UniProtKB/Swiss-Prot annotation:
Protein name per Swiss-Prot or TrEMBL: Unknown protein 7 from 2D-PAGE
Miscellaneous section: On the 2D-gel the determined MW of this unknown protein is: 65 kDa.
Organism domain of life: Bacteria
Species annotation: Fructilactobacillus sanfranciscensis (Lactobacillus sanfranciscensis)
Induction notes from the record: By elevated hydrostatic pressure.
Length: 11
């Protein structure tokens, strides 16, 4: 969810 795709970005 940040500027770069993080593992936690999965929503």
């Amino acid at each position: 969810g940040s500027f770069f795709a993080t593992p936690d970005d999965r929503h």
